[in-house]
Design a protein with these regions (language model features):
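Phosphate/adenylate-binding "loop-and-lid" substructures adjacent to NTP/NAD/dNTP-binding pockets
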Residues: 237-305
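Basic, flexible Lys/Arg- and Gly-enriched helix-loop patches that mediate nucleic-acid binding at interfaces
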Residues: 1-236
Length: 305
């Protein structure tokens, strides 16, 4: 009998959607297992008949990553609402793919689409410092003070944006490189400083660019790009692991010294679980990782599965 796995992971590996989106589809009653509505946390195997929106789900053999030059007016959703054109309807790709992240309806430029859920998780994982580059035109002239304040960080959505690189390219235009992806971040940053975005185009995500892709067209990732992307993702994962180890170490010391609690137990558990997942993904355990004391061998490298 085939090994059973959680249904959100099954759907992710089948290229239907990310695990988070799978959980949402399950809650909405859009997923069935052997004719019955799926339940959150349910486990399935290849012997089960899984359907998404009444369409049978099969594991993908070919893994795909598309680079799409999205025009304005296309929504980054796999579910059509009203008379909007979704990115999947627009592409009409022979395999079922879904967007990696978002690019709002009014924005244009590089959008990645894939049928590999784990890749989505790696790219979108919070805390990974993946570069994304944009060209932006605003409604009035920018100056050195605007560039300075945008670069330093702007208060939006109950936080302050990370420092970023901003270069003025024209009287009313600039390029910006972000390492985070808050909702409508650039538009909110500009609005805070008294500007309105008139054009927003994403030019690059990590090593992947729009070069050679006309608006409305797409191409598959090349073998060389795959190799470079995997290297960047692994490097980013290691950086995130180091950050997590430092935070967990500070929290543990504060606890044993009966100091002020710097994070809640829930936050500690979430970071610990993320660290374990990254260790499994990369096959690496840092020498000072707190997971070493709970069954891991204290080595720098572990065999990858």
């Amino acid at each position: 009998m085939d090994e059973k796995i959680r249904i959100n992971k099954y759907l992710s590996e089948a290229g239907i959607c990310s695990r988070r989106e799978a959980d949402r589809m399950i809650e909405e009653g859009r997923i069935t297992v052997n004719g019955k509505k799926a339940e959150s946390g349910q486990k399935v195997s290849l012997e089960d008949e899984v359907c998404a929106d009444n369409i049978p789900v099969h594991k993908n053999e070919k893994k795909v990553l598309l680079l799409f030059n999205k025009p304005r007016g296309i929504v980054c959703s796999t579910k059509q609402q009203f008379d909007e054109t979704t990115v999947t309807d627009y592409l009409d790709y022979p395999l079922r793919v879904y967007p990696v992240g978002r690019l709002d309806k009014e924005s244009q430029g590089l959008l990645l689409l894939t049928n590999e859920g784990d890749l989505v998780n790696k790219i979108m994982r919070a805390g990974n410092y993946h570069e994304k580059e944009y060209f932006v035109t605003v409604n009035k002239p920018v100056d050195s003070e605007f560039v300075r304040r945008m670069s330093k960080g702007v208060p939006v959505l109950d936080t302050v944006t990370r420092p970023c690189r901003v270069v003025q390219t024209g009287e009313c235009s600039f390029r910006i490189i972000l390492t985070q992806g808050l909702n409508r971040q650039i538009r909110r940053m500009c609005r805070y400083l008294g500007y309105e975005v008139q054009k927003l185009k994403r030019l690059r995500i990590m090593n992947l660019t729009l070069d050679g892709i006309r608006e409305g067209e797409y191409r598959e990732i090349t073998a060389q790009e795959w190799e470079e992307l995997n290297h960047l993702l692994e490097t980013a994962a290691i950086m995130r692991m180091k950050e997590l180890v430092q935070k967990l170490d500070r929290a543990a010391k504060a606890y044993y010294q009966q100091d002020t609690e710097i994070i809640s137990n829930r936050e500690y558990d979430q970071m610990y679980d993320e660290l374990q997942a990254l260790e499994k993904e990369t096959g690496t355990v840092l020498a000072n990782s707190p997971t070493v004391s709970v069954g891991y061998e204290a080595v720098d490298q572990l065999p990858k599965e």
